[in-house]
């Protein structure tokens, strides 16, 4: 009886010591825990909790507090392994324009302004060139325009060259016409086949010419033969 009581008392003392040690490891304000990295402290606490759990399971009356300690240690390790919330990235400020960029922008603006002014000048010049010329004022009917008499004909308005041609006459105009295409010599090769044969060839027989007396005789003969061939009438 005494031995059993001493054994139970010893087990209770060991349990109290284990709980005190575990509470020290679970307290983050403890200097040993604060100096130890979190991963090392968590792994050491988990190992110690597992050892205590195995030791209590070997006893006749296991202590469930060691199991609760292991579960809490696992939760703490899982919470420490969760990633920290990612902060949204800070907006990147555009770089300030440099002096070279400002100079290029100013030069481009000056160049575009000069080009625009040149184009406007060109358009103005084109408009002046395309503007209609003022026409001469038409006077009243019968009045000469530009010193030209309204009674002049169309041939008179042609100028002095036409007057010279009219003075020379129409014969000079016809003499200038090229009549070479109308020459008979150009048509000789085409009309050679139409020429009569050589003189030595047989000549065509021409019908004999009859006099008027012979014609009258022939007419009388023809009339007489027709009268003979006609049958006599019933009264004859």
Swiss-Prot record:
Gene Ontology biological process terms, A to Z: negative regulation of cell growth; positive regulation of DNA-templated transcription; positive regulation of transcription by RNA polymerase II
Pfam families given in the database record: SERTA
Tissues with expression: Detected at in testis, lung and, at lower levels, in muscle, liver, spleen, brain and heart.
A cellular-component GO term for this protein: cytoplasm
Keywords for the protein's UniProt record, in alphabetical order: Transcription, Transcription regulation, Ubl conjugation
Post-translational modification summary for this protein: Polyubiquitinated, which promotes proteasomal degradation.
InterPro entries xrefs: E2F-SERTA_domain_protein, SERTA_dom
Protein name: SERTA domain-containing protein 1
Gene symbol of the encoding locus: Sertad1
């Amino acid at each position: 009886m005494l031995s059993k009581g001493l054994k139970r008392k010893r087990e209770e003392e060991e349990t109290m010591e284990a709980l005190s040690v575990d509470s020290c490891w679970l307290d983050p304000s403890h200097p040993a825990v604060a100096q130890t990295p979190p991963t090392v402290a968590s792994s050491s606490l988990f190992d110690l909790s597992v050892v205590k759990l195995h030791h209590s399971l070997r006893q006749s009356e296991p202590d469930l507090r060691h199991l609760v300690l292991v579960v809490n240690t696992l939760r703490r390790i899982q919470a420490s392994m969760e990633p920290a919330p990612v902060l949204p990235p800070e907006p990147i400020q555009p770089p300030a324009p440099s002096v070279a960029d400002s100079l290029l922008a100013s030069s481009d603006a000056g160049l575009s302004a000069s080009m625009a002014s040149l184009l406007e000048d060109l358009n103005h010049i084109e408009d002046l060139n395309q503007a209609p010329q003022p026409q001469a004022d038409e006077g009243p009917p019968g009045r000469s325009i530009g010193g030209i008499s309204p009674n002049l004909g169309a041939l008179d308005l042609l100028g002095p060259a036409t007057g010279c041609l009219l003075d020379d006459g129409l014969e000079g105009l016809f003499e200038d016409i090229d009549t070479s295409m109308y020459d008979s010599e150009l048509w000789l090769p085409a009309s050679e086949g139409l020429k009569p044969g050589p003189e030595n060839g047989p000549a065509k027989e021409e019908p004999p010419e009859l006099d008027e007396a012979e014609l009258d005789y022939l007419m009388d003969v023809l009339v007489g033969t027709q009268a003979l061939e006609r049958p006599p009438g019933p009264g004859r």
